[in-house]
């Protein structure tokens, strides 16, 4: 399970260190792709297989299903950690998520998310105000 928030930087070659707490669970190779809210999603290979199976159940007769699958899968790439614990983020994904230098990597249960730091900070501030209301609307159990 992935959790936590870590600040890192992209180097000039588009490489970024993956937090050490995430590396063990991700293994040496994992998948990154376009996420929602202008971030990147990162999945273990096992989790990615489960997502693929779920996506196969989407009705191809629905235009939005086709559109979503095209965007999601066309952006997917398998990445490999180098000896320094870095991955190379392709230019098309850096552009999609507006990743330039300062990044934030967060753990979200079954995936990691890679954000432009300013975009993450804006999202966090906006969401922090409504966190309790969202919990009340969505969660039907105590924790």
Swiss-Prot record:
CDD domains: MraZ_C (cd16321), MraZ_N (cd16320)
Chief place of localization: cytoplasm
Domain SpoVT-AbrB positions: 5-47, 76-119
Matches recorded under SUPFAM superfamilies: AbrB/MazE/MraZ-like
Transcription regulation recorded as keyword: yes
Compartment(s): Cytoplasm, Nucleoid
UniProt entry keywords in alphabetical sequence: Cytoplasm, DNA-binding, Repeat, Transcription, Transcription regulation
UniProt keyword annotation of Cell cycle present: no
GO cellular component: cytoplasm; nucleoid
GO biological process: negative regulation of DNA-templated transcription initiation
Pfam family, one: MraZ
UniProt subunit comment: Forms oligomers.
NCBIfam families linked: division/cell wall cluster transcriptional repressor MraZ
Lineage: Bacteria, Bacillati, Bacillota, Bacilli, Bacillales
GO molecular function, one term: transcription cis-regulatory region binding
Protein name per the record: Transcriptional regulator MraZ
The encoding gene: mraZ
Family: Belongs to the MraZ family.
